[in-house]
Structures are given as structure tokens and as C-alpha cells.
Amino acid sequence: MTVAEEIRVLRERMNLSQREISSMVGYCHRTIVRWEQGKSIPKTAVLQYLREISKKQNTGKVNGNPAFRFIDLFAGIGGMRLGFEMAGGKCVFTCEWNAEARKTYEANFPGDHRFAGDIREVRPEDVPPYDVLVAGFPCQPFSIAGVSKKNALGRPHGFLCETQGTLFFEVARLLEAHRPPVFILENVKNLVNHDKGNTFRVILGTLRDELGYSVHCRVIDAKGWVPQHRERIFIVGFRENAGFSFDNLEFPDTFRGPTLGSILHPEDGSELAESPYTMGEMATVSEKYTLSDRLWKYLQDYATKHQAKGNGFGFGLFGPKDVARTLSARYYKDGSEILIHRKEGNPRRLTPRECARLMGFDRPGQPFFRIPVSDTQAYKQFGNAVVVPVVETVAKGILPFLETETSETAPLFSRKTG
């Protein structure tokens, strides 16, 4: 391992940004960048200091004595897991059927427990003891885009969809079998209105009346945490009426949230180039993310046509001071919902790395979230994901309502008896 590689590894182990390392050792940020690029070498004393600090931090690693244990269903690429781990939890079981999503998940969470595929094949006895059931159950059957598409094709949707709609009931099956103290479910905002509200009524009826949980719901807009207008519904259930209320959680001001400048590649040499997203000494965004003349003309013509009809279809063009639209799983097709304005030439798409930042997977002072898949798959995966810091906030909000006994010998989990 070269000195440059060691410095980067040490920094990532400590979950620190280059600027934070700069403050720690008393050298300017540009010098830290040069160290990691191998263009200069730090003094031996500085390198030894970083080694010692990293060693001390890693002797008390998180999740060794977790505050609670949780299972991650319909796990996707691990956004719910990241948020719950940041709240002090430990994942003990994962279920995700999509091979590409699983590839990304396993690249970031090396296996230390069973990883199941099809949830319909999971038996209750296959799942280890846990305190919280976490599930972002498949959202497409209930999303506005998904319903419109299925209606146009004459296909069933929601709970009538044989491939995905009934998967909520697989969640209910495990809740009924295990009776965990708490569950948290996440879905698209349109779940509330789907099928004139009947779908949501069935879900709440199952959770409250059939399973006997105290259930609380809230639609949360992520733009207080990340520069993206993204509304999702969170459904939290407690086995006992614990007195929980979303009103007691502290959410950031949605009118004072971050802007896109906080997640865009700076292209000024202050970050290391990451192929294939950025390149060169200044780490400029690769030209492949710039729209071709043909695609840019098509998007402009398409927007003009629909504006004349009085509807809102069209591209979204944004700059560093803006907040973006919702990143969707179809972003890989043309990137039209979030295009980045450039001083010269056609606009560009976000890179997958910027998408990771936009969804809160990459945060200051933490190692890069690994993206081992193609751009097409990455766009789909981040578009289907949750915003990590939103999940973290909700997860921390339930902690006071969980029992505190969490030793290996006495987990909170209690199986159904009788």
C-alpha cells in the first residue's frame, strides 16, 4: 500500500472528510488532497499520528453492543439499514430478491448474517431474534407513475398486482408470527390515495385491527435533509401504545435545507477524480453525462408541446442554488427530471455519485458508498431508494420508546406463544 492509499484508508476508517483531516493535522485542505493524490508525502510524525488516532477510534467500533436489533426487508441497496445503523441498531437479517440491488448491498455490507431472496420463501423460524422490523415494501404498484402505466396497459395494480401487490401481506405474516416491539414501513406518498384510499385502509386495518399494533403515519419531505423535493410516507407501529407521536420528532426546516451545490462535483480540484464519473486533476465531470444535441433538442420540443397543452410534463433544469425534483427510478432513460445547468454547452445528468449524495448515502466524513453496478442500474437503484438521513431521524425518534435491555442473552424480541 502506498502512502497516498494509506492516508485515504485511514481517513475513511475514521469517517472524516479531507477538510476535517486538514483541521486535525494543521495543514491546508489542498495539501491533504495532494497527499491522497500521491503528489506530496506527509511528515512521518503526521502519518504516525493519523495511525494512532485511527487505531483508538476502531477499538470502540459501533454496533459491538447495539441499542437494538432489526431486520431489513425489501432491502434494496441498504438505505433503511444505513439509517438504522446510524441510530445505533444492528441488522441481523436481510431480504432482497433483485440480483443487481443485492450486488450493491453486499458491496457495502459484507455478509455477517443470512441474506434471503424471495420473502415468500422466508419461514418465521428462519429469522433470528430482533426488535424492529424495517421494510420499504415495493412501491411501484402504488406510485402515480406505476398506476398510470399499468392502467394504460390494462394491467392490475396495487393489491391486485400478482407479482408485487401482495408482498405487503408477507410483511404482515412475519409481524403476526414474531410480534416485534416496533416496525417501520416506508412507501411512496401516493399510497394514501391509491384506489380512492382503499389500499391504505386495507394496510392500516391489517396493522391495527388484525395485528393489534398502535400505528402512526406521516408523509415526510426530504428537502430539509437533502436538496431534493421527495415526499414519502412512513408508517410506524408499536406493539404497545407507547405514546409515540411524529409531532415530537425534530425535523429540519424544509425552507432552509441544503441546495444542489452541496452534492454536485465541485470540478475545482478539491476532490479526487473518481473514474468513470470525474476525471483529470480538477476532477471534472465526464463528458458522457452531458446531453447530446439530439436529446437536448428532443427534451426542449417535448416540454414545449406539453406546455401548450397545459400540463406539467417536461425537463427540470437546476443550478447549484436550487432544490431538485424527485429522483425517480427512470432517471437512466434521459435524466430529464433533474438536469444540471452548465455555463457552456448542453446541460448534463447527475452522476451516480451525485445521486448517492442526493439520497444521503454519501455524507461528509464518511467513506464513499460503493457503486459496483452500471450507471443504468445505479440510477434505478438510487431512484428506488430512501433518503438515508430521513430514516436516521425516524429511527432515533423511536429509541426512547424501545425497552433498554439489549444484551446478547436478553434481546427485546419475543416470539408469539400459545
Residue ranges and their predicted role:
Residues 122-132, 144-326:
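Class I S-adenosyl-L-methionine
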Residues 57-179, 189-193, 198:
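Core alpha/beta nucleotide-donor-binding catalytic domains of modification enzymes
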Residues 26-41:
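Recognition helix of helix-turn-helix/homeodomain-like DNA-binding domains
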Residues 7, 21-22, 32-35:
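Conserved hydrophobic/aromatic packing and binding residues within compact polymer-binding modules
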Residues 42-60:
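DNA major-groove recognition helix of helix-turn-helix/homeodomain DNA-binding modules
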Residues 1-13:
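A short, Lys/Arg-rich alpha-helix, primarily the initiator
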Residues 18-21, 28, 43, 287-418:
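C-terminal target-recognition/interaction regions appended to catalytic cores
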